[in-house]
Curated annotation (Swiss-Prot):
Residues 382-401 have a biased composition (Polar residues). Residues 1-195 form the SMP-LTD domain. One of its GO terms (molecular function) is lipid binding. The keyword Mitochondrion applies. This is Mitochondrial distribution and morphology protein 34. Residues 358-370 have a biased composition (Basic residues). It comes from the Eukaryota. Disulfide bonds: none annotated. PANTHER family: MITOCHONDRIAL DISTRIBUTION AND MORPHOLOGY PROTEIN 34 (PTHR28185:SF1). Keywords: Lipid transport, Lipid-binding, Membrane, Mitochondrion, Mitochondrion outer membrane, Transmembrane, Transmembrane beta strand, Transport. It comes from Aspergillus terreus (strain NIH 2624 / FGSC A1156). Lacks alpha-helical transmembrane segments, suggesting that it resides in the membrane via beta-sheet conformations similar to those predicted for other outer membrane proteins and porin. Component of the ER-mitochondria encounter structure (ERMES) or MDM complex, composed of mmm1, mdm10, mdm12 and mdm34.
Length: 565
């Protein structure tokens, strides 16, 4: 089966070429152009030539009077040509810098000056070969689809043929663009041309669209001053009167100020401020876009700053760090008695950090040394008792406490109104408790310390046989021996003080059933009971907070009593 194509009517129709040139121009400018081309590509001349393409029928799928579908093998080596006109950039440095970010370029002044040269390109000697799927319908036009890349070669002639480098570059670029044109744009162009030829409705719709486009482009422009805003202002933000608005026009020789609503100016100012910085002391620099700025609601917070009539003043925002407790100078704040969080103890005051070195985790538990070096010279009984007391207190030591300073001794009136006089100095003194053990002892050891302090304040002395008898009775060699064997020389004073109160359960470790309580013993026991009750009340007030010692209200420290009394 053979077909006879009438190629001459297509060459004679001038309107067909005009429409084809417009479609080709739109198709060439649709895809992204290389940076060297700085202007639109315009098709100035198009000629299909006198030699038709050769078609070989491979398959016919549908055949009727008004429709046809088949697969062809096409080959073309004719005299068709195409002429294009555009402008190119002759300075390669300018092209290079346009494709790079500004911060990565040296920004030359004269070397990157653009130099555009008009360029005319003629494409001829097309050689095409490929498989084409052709679908023809009078209602839907012609649809052509290339199953492969049909372009084999073509000849590119330009004004830069004398420069081999530019000629080869243009050859490669144009071939790449034409391959895209044949595969994507040419089928759409052929389909639109066929609709214009065989479908009258499509032709009438295109004519109406062209008329509407021409009508919209003609006529005088709209005057934006015909309906001015309600509250117009000039470029400096000053309000304009009606007479000043009437004097303004588009054709006026006087410089026309842009009229904006005050509400819109505030919105634009807020939008501009939102892109500025959050820095407190960043000046307002012209032609500089900041990242962010504070909101216009905070414009009254700053006293001095760079302001403009179009934007509110820069406000100062106070930033706070969450989770960190601030220090207060008032030591009597009630909230300081409670433990808020871990960060409160992390950022402690200076006083609590004085003993942090000796209460570190590396020295939390001191090794207990119960071995006595017998090679040393023999010590007196008082020193031996001191060693025994030290070891006994070490054995009752619990986990290290968080307190870094001893509790202060407060001068307070005791429960007993009668205070016995201090006894004269004696050669025997109670052994002092080392500071490191007194800081870290538990509750029972603290009560022993209270009894020792009370006896140290009274400073009473006893006879040597009584001390030996106390050492035999009491194995622990604690100050309880002296409590049970005090001389009864304050009997008369105790009777004047009144009947004794019932002892609390906390004093039971200091008493013994087999000992006969005397008047002096009752007086000391009552004093010790009152001291223990007072300290228990203070402990309940202070709680377990390590900062409670420094925040106790209404207490003044007094120096400890002299140990030599």
């Amino acid at each position: 089966m053979a077909f006879n194509f009438n190629w001459s009517p297509l060459m004679a129709d001038a309107s067909f070429y005009t429409r084809a040139q417009d479609l080709l121009t739109a198709a060439l400018n649709k895809s992204p152009k290389p940076p060297i081309i700085v202007d639109d590509i315009i098709v100035t001349e198009l000629n299909l030539g006198s030699i038709p393409p050769e078609l070989e029928i491979l398959e016919i799928g549908d055949l009727a009077e008004d429709r046809f579908r088949g697969i062809f093998k096409m080959s073309y080596s004719g005299d068709a040509f195409l002429t294009l006109k555009t402008r190119v950039q002759a300075n390669p440095l300018n092209t290079y810098l346009l494709t790079r970010p500004s911060f990565a370029s040296p920004l030359p002044l004269a070397a990157a000056t653009p130099l555009t040269i008009p360029l005319q390109i003629t494409l001829s000697d097309f050689k095409l070969s490929g498989f084409v799927i052709l679908v023809f319908s009078k209602q839907k036009g012609i649809t052509v689809v290339f199953r492969n890349d049909p372009l084999e070669s073509l000849k590119v002639s330009s004004t830069f043929d004398s420069i081999p480098f530019v000629r080869d570059f243009l050859q490669r670029e144009i071939e790449a663009q034409l391959r895209i044109l044949f595969m994507d744009e040419l089928p759409a162009i052929i389909h639109r041309l066929s609709l214009r030829l065989w479908v009258p409705e499509y032709r009438a719709g295109e004519e109406d669209q062209d008329q509407n486009t021409n009508t919209a482009g003609e006529g005088p422009g709209q005057d934006p001053l015909a309906s001015p805003p309600q509250d117009p202002v000039d470029a400096l933000g000053n309000a304009l009167n009606e007479s000043e608005i009437a004097s303004l026009s588009l054709d006026s020789s006087v410089e026309t100020h842009s009229l904006f609503s005050q509400k819109n100016l505030l919105r634009l100012a807020a939008l501009t401020d939102s892109q500025r910085t959050l820095s407190l002391f960043t000046p307002s620099i012209q032609e500089v876009v900041y990242r962010a700025w504070t909101s216009p609601s905070d414009q009254g917070d700053i006293s001095g700053g760079v302001t403009s009539p179009l934007s509110p003043a820069l406000s100062r925002t106070q930033s706070q760090v969450g989770g960190m407790s601030s220090f207060q100078d008032n030591a009597s704040t009630i909230s300081s008695y409670s433990r808020t969080s871990t960060s409160t103890h992390t950022f402690s005051t200076y006083g609590l950090n004085l003993g942090a070195g000796r209460h570190s985790k590396a020295h939390a538990r001191k090794r207990k040394k119960r071995v006595v070096d017998l090679r040393r010279p023999k010590q007196p009984e008082s020193e031996t008792a001191s060693v025994t007391d030290e070891s006994s207190f070490t054995e009752t030591t619990s986990a290290p406490s968080v307190r870094s300073a001893p509790l202060p001794r407060v001068n307070e009136q005791p429960d007993d109104p009668v205070t016995p006089p201090l006894s004269p100095d004696s050669d025997f003194h109670l052994p002092p408790i080392p500071e490191r053990h007194r800081f870290s002892i538990s509750r029972p050891a603290l009560r022993r310390d209270i009894a020792t302090e009370m006896l140290r304040e009274t400073g009473e002395s006893s006879s040597e046989p009584a001390r030996r008898h106390a050492e035999v009775d009491d194995i622990d060699a604690t100050p309880r021996t002296i409590i049970r064997h005090e001389p009864s020389r304050y009997e008369g004073e105790k009777q004047e003080a009144g009947p004794s109160r019932q002892l609390p359960s906390t004093i039971l470790p200091f008493t013994e059933e087999k000992s006969t309580p005397g008047p002096v013993d009752q007086a000391l026991v009552e004093r010790i009971a009152g001291e223990i009750a007072r300290r228990m009340r203070e402990d309940k007030l202070m709680g377990t907070n390590s900062c409670a010692f420094w925040n106790r209200p209404g207490h003044e420290e007094s120096p400890p009593p002299a140990y030599g009394q």
